[in-house]
Amino acid sequence: MSIEIVQKSLFNIIEAVADAVTASQATKRCRLVAVSKTKSADLIEACYSQNQRHFGENYVQELEEKSDVLASKCLDIRWHFIGQVQSNKIGKICNSPGLWCVETVETEKHARIFDKEWSKHGANLSPLRVLVQVNTSGEDNKGGIEIGEAPKLAEFIRKECQNLKFDGFMTIGSFDNSHASGENPDFEKLFKVRQTWAEQTGESADSVELSMGMSDDFLQAIHQGATSVRVGSKLFGAREYKNK
């Protein structure tokens, strides 16, 4: 997809997000995270030039390479790691220039390692934002902690990980729910997880994020309370994989 088409798509998506927020009774704000996996640094830079700042990567190697290439060109780019976390790669994630948030923390073990690694790589920076990934669909092929355990993990991060900032909850909805009409039960469940956490802690639910919704269902996610949506193919076109 050409730079011009991507920039036009970005403009249209930003407008759609803004309109959806205005119409939503469940959220007053929503961030667009442009999911750039398998896409070139040039396309990311083209979006950055149009004031897009938040970008998401699923693969550690891509995050490493792109963040390094763009560090001197896109000075305030904000990278989100949104892929499955592997313990032995957490150090590489934390060492990526411009890392802003890890959205896929699902165990205390991973939280502890991120806390330790960020103290090395991000010693002069603010605490690393992390989201607790919740498996709202109950599918075995989806990452995330069980719904009932999510508030507990959030509190573990808040109380035990001084180099991390618990910043909310994230989910990847099931394919069927994402392509059905009407209310999405996965989004409803994540919204309730945040409410439960707020009730248990006395904190404001609105003080933390709800990252839910992707290219096919981000408007519905905003309708149901998303404060951050992850849009890839609708912005950049279909994923591109090298021939093996």
Curated annotation (Swiss-Prot):
Keyword Repeat among UniProt keywords: no
N6-(pyridoxal phosphate)lysine PTM sites in chain numbering: K37
GO biological process, one term: vitamin B6 metabolic process
Entries under CDD domains matching the protein: PLPDE_III_YBL036c_euk
Record-level GO cellular component terms: cytoplasm
Molecular-function annotations in GO: pyridoxal phosphate binding
Keywords assigned by UniProt, alphabetized: Pyridoxal phosphate
Transmembrane intervals: none
Keyword Iron: no
Family: Belongs to the pyridoxal phosphate-binding protein YggS/PROSC family.
Entry function: Pyridoxal 5'-phosphate (PLP)-binding protein, which may be involved in intracellular homeostatic regulation of pyridoxal 5'-phosphate (PLP), the active form of vitamin B6.
Designated name of the protein: Pyridoxal phosphate homeostasis protein
Organism of this sequence: Caenorhabditis elegans
